[in-house]
């Protein structure tokens, strides 16, 4: 092992260690280290703050290759931000955790963590120990989560009445670039989830929902297809563009004459030899096509390609085919059509065929772009959301927005309790934490009050982004919540003339809101317990 330093002795013979390269290392300790962390976290949170809510602004991210992404999604913004500070990287991870677990609320969790650290900075300046602040935050988070359980309402999750789910999805999509048609998008997301949901296990398999996009048309042209869309076309332009009552052979084996496993060499010495080889290949192809047709199949979908000669023979024998279909699409087609994937040609039987009511090739506008749509499948639990849009950026943002909406609906199927948005839940929790703080006889009381103040940053950011006076709006709503004992009163971001979020149908999932508070508190607690940073300094040239 490499030596880390040199052992030396003082004048009394006592040993001490001189650590190597200590002069080239930077070190921050105590309050200075904490302030450095808080400053980095605040910088990230302040960047995200303007993206919060239905009137939140989008961010344009340009990567090293010059590719542009315009997005409102917190996790996407943070993942594309080029951050160097260690704590800023932790904020990125925090947002990713929220995205992986819940799928929505990624901006809010970062803004809340930044507000908690900002409040902690003021307490540190007043001489309160970081551990006491962390403990106070922990107590306050527990109270807030218990209070959320008390003020939550249940939403009826019923396939025959999807309206409550649509209203929740609309809240999620309200802040996105697709909010011009968010009712339509919410309906598409809800129908997709309810189609594939397993209501007995209360779970949703996202593998059965495929999201495809094609540039052209308008966002309003987006539709839900009860089947699979593949970004391929029939292998020959003269093949029929539509196959009705398709019996599909799903092949992952090469569509070509078999090759010996061992190394081999074939000498073609004359024209006759070459013709004989060509004849053998043709006979073998015809034999394979005959084998497919004997099973009753009238469409072949291959993972691998086949040459032009085979393509011509398929056309001659009236067997439409699709080549170079990717692995995930092959699996989805097999699930949707109820077919079995055939890895060896010899194993193909009629029992392994998939069934679809219609397989057709569709074209787009004046371009040569074509796609294959497989509909009316045997298993109706596989769906595709097909997005249209003016450019690639809008389609990518629509995909991210729909991902958030799909996650929110899945969370409602798992746990159908909701709280009201527009900052209503945060204001109610802040009031509950403040009341409990007054009963706390220890120093943690200050931290609990600071936690309540931090919770109010979310509704203040919402009102600020909506062009209101944040302090005045916040004061009025807080006073009304206490006076009317109504935890559904929040910020009227859309200027509809009512602060009642229940009336406005601004709904958020309870599981998502709990996760926000819990993750932000854990993160802040971890940061407050760091009091020493050592990192290598700039190397001397």
Curated annotation (Swiss-Prot):
ATP binds at residues 53, 106-107, 422. GO terms for molecular function: ATP binding; ATP hydrolysis activity; ATP-dependent protein folding chaperone; beta-tubulin binding; G-protein beta-subunit binding; mRNA 3'-UTR binding; mRNA 5'-UTR binding; unfolded protein binding. The modification N-acetylalanine is found at residue 2. It is found in: Cytoplasm; Cytoplasm, Cytoskeleton, Microtubule organizing center, Centrosome. Disulfide bonds: none annotated. Its EC number is 3.6.1.-. PROSITE patterns: TCP1_1 (PS00750), TCP1_2 (PS00751), TCP1_3 (PS00995). Keywords: Acetylation, ATP-binding, Chaperone, Cytoplasm, Cytoskeleton, Hydrolase, Isopeptide bond, Magnesium, Metal-binding, Nucleotide-binding, Phosphoprotein, Ubl conjugation. Gene3D superfamilies: GroEL, GroEL-like equatorial domain, TCP-1-like chaperonin intermediate domain. There is a cross-link at residues 20, 210, 214, 265, 275, 279, 392 (Glycyl lysine isopeptide (Lys-Gly) (interchain with G-Cter in SUMO2)). ADP binds at residues 53, 105-107, 175, 422, 492, 508, 513. Mg(2+) binds at residue 104. PANTHER family: CHAPERONIN (PTHR11353). This is T-complex protein 1 subunit epsilon. It comes from Mus musculus (Mouse). The gene is Cct5.
């Amino acid at each position: 092992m490499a030596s880390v330093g040199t052992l030396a002795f003082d004048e009394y013979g006592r040993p001490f260690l001189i650590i190597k390269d200590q002069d080239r290392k930077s070190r921050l300790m105590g309050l200075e280290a904490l302030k450095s962390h808080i400053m980095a976290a605040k910088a990230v949170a302040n960047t995200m703050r303007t993206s919060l809510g239905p009137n939140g602004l989008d961010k344009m991210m340009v990567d090293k290759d010059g590719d542009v992404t315009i997005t409102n999604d917190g996790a996407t913004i943070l993942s594309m931000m080029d951050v160097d500070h260690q704590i800023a990287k932790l904020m990125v991870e925090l947002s990713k955790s929220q995205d992986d677990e819940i799928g929505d609320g990624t901006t809010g969790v970062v803004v809340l963590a930044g507000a908690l650290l900002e409040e902690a900075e003021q307490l540190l300046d007043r001489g309160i120990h970081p551990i006491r602040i962390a403990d106070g935050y922990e107590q306050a988070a527990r109270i807030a989560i218990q209070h959320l359980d008390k003020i939550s309402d249940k939403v009826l999750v019923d396939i025959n009445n999807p309206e409550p789910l649509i209203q929740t999805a609309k809240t999620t999509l309200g802040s996105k670039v697709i909010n011009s048609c968010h009712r339509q998008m919410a309906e598409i997301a809800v129908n997709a989830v309810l189609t594939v949901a397993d209501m007995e296990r209360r779970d949703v398999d996202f593998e059965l929902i495929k999201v495809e996009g094609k540039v052209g048309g308008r966002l309003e042209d987006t539709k839900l297809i009860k089947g699979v869309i593949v970004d391929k076309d029939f292998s020959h332009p003269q093949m029929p563009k539509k196959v009705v009552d398709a019996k599909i052979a799903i092949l992952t084996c090469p569509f070509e004459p078999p090759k010996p496993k061992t190394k081999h060499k074939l000498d073609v010495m004359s024209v006759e030899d070459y013709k004989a080889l060509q004849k053998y290949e043709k006979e073998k192809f015809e034999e394979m096509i005959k084998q497919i047709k004997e099973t009753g199949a009238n469409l072949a979908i291959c993972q691998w390609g086949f040459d032009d000669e085979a393509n011509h023979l398929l056309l001659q024998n009236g067997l439409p085919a699709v080549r170079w279909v990717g692995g995930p699409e092959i699996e989805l087609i097999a699930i949707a059509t109820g077919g079995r994937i055939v890895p060896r040609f010899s194993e193909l039987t009629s029992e392994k065929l998939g069934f679809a009511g219609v397989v057709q090739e569709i074209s787009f506008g004046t371009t040569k772009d074509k796609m294959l749509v497989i509909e009316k499948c045997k298993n109706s639990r596989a769906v595709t959301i097909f997005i249209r849009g003016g450019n690639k950026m809008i389609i990518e943002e629509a995909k991210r927005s729909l991902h958030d909406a799909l996650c929110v609906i899945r969370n409602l199927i798992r746990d159908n309790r909701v709280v009201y948005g527009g900052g209503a839940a945060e204001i109610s929790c802040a009031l509950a934490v403040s009341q409990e703080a007054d009963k706390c006889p220890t120093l943690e009381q200050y931290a609990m009050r600071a936690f309540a103040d931090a919770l109010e940053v979310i509704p203040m950011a919402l009102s600020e982004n909506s062009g209101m006076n944040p302090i005045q709006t916040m004061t009025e709503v807080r006073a009304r919540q206490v006076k009317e004992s109504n935890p559904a009163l929040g910020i009227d971001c859309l200027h509809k003339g009512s602060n009642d979020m229940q009336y406005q149908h601004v709904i958020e999932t309870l599981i998502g809101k709990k996760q926000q508070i819990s993750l932000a508190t854990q993160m802040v607690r971890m940061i407050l317990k760091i009091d020493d940073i050592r990192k290598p300094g700039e190397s001397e040239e």
